[in-house]
Curated annotation (Swiss-Prot):
Provenance organism: Arabidopsis thaliana (Mouse-ear cress)
BP GO annotations: amino acid biosynthetic process; aromatic amino acid family biosynthetic process; chorismate metabolic process; prephenate(2-) biosynthetic process
UniProt key word Metal-binding: no
Record-linked PANTHER family: CHORISMATE MUTASE
Expression sites by tissue: Expressed in roots, stems, cauline leaves and flowers, and at lower levels in rosette leaves and siliques.
One Gene Ontology molecular-function label: chorismate mutase activity
Entry protein name: Chorismate mutase 2
Gene: CM2
Lineage: Eukaryota, Viridiplantae, Streptophyta, Embryophyta, Tracheophyta
Gene Ontology cellular-component terms listed: cytosol
Length: 265
């Protein structure tokens, strides 16, 4: 994953936040998200993995998927995953400190706004709204692999959505005079209007649709080329675009708004 910093030897600072690198990272994350959806679509819904809870040895109750995510995040935290500001855990209360030294990136985000985390909302939306749209109904019993695939999707979606913190910081630095009145008034609606660029959003949706068409085609050597009606896709390209338009982009802007509301604290 490309980091969102670049050298700036002329300014005297070793690193600066770069909008170009943020854009580049967001475009690359589209690839990751589309591929993660394709991988998850290999399995049916397998709802018992995330809906059915059982009592653990600790006395707490957890679904298989929640247990898998919690335990995976603990291991990842111990090797430093969550030392990077673009990574946000789903179960923050579980996260230990890294046991290995990690590279210290400059503090590009505002400290009081750094803690914005909407992963609980992302979790609920993913399992209740998104997942049933792009996987087949059914249960094949392959819950461990399904949970691993769900975690890959969740982390890819979360990373993309929480990049809103970096986007908001760059936009604020570029034009603080535009944002400060709305921030001081704690006016969410005004901030959302400032952050909305419909032409850019449409371009993103079209690019994601094209990537889903390209990455998700069923390749057949004996079929006629150019017959769009016969093409089959592992994930519907229009649905991939819709996921961005109805969930990912709005949630990213929600993170941007929540970040900016704390930017002057």
């Amino acid at each position: 994953m490309a980091r969102v910093f670049e050298s700036d030897s002329g300014s005297g600072c070793s690193n600066v936040l770069s909008l170009d690198l943020i854009r580049e990272s967001l475009i690359r994350q589209e690839d990751t998200i589309v591929f993660s959806l394709i991988e998850r679509a290999k399995f049916p819904l397998n709802s018992p993995a995330f809906e059915e809870s059982r009592c653990l040895d600790s006395g707490s109750f957890s679904s298989l998927t929640e247990f898998f995510v919690r335990e995976t995040e603990i291991i990842q935290a111990k090797v430093g995953r969550y030392e990077y500001p673009e990574e946000n855990p789903f179960f923050l209360e579980n996260i230990p400190h890294s046991v290995f030294p990690t590279h210290k990136y400059p503090s590009a985000l505002h400290p009081k706004a750094l803690s914005v985390n909407i992963n609980k909302q992302i979790w609920d939306i993913y399992f209740k709204e998104l997942l049933p749209l792009f996987v087949k109904p059914g249960d094949d019993g392959n819950y461990p692999s399904t949970a691993a695939s769900d975690l890959a999707c969740l982390q890819a979606l979360s990373r993309r959505i929480h990049y809103g913190k970096f986007v908001a910081e760059v936009k604020f630095r570029d034009a603080p005079q535009d944002y400060e009145p709305a921030i001081r008034a704690q006016d969410r609606e005004a901030l959302m209007k400032l952050l909305t660029f419909e032409k850019v959003e449409e371009m993103v949706k079209k690019r994601v649709q094209k990537k889903a068409e390209t990455f998700g085609q069923e390749v057949k050597f004996n079929s006629g080329y150019g017959d769009e009606s016969k093409k089959k896709y592992k994930v519907d390209p229009l649905l991939a675009s819709r996921i961005y338009g109805e969930w990912l982009i709005p949630l990213t802007k929600l993170v941007e708004v929540e970040y900016l509301l704390r930017r002057l604290d």
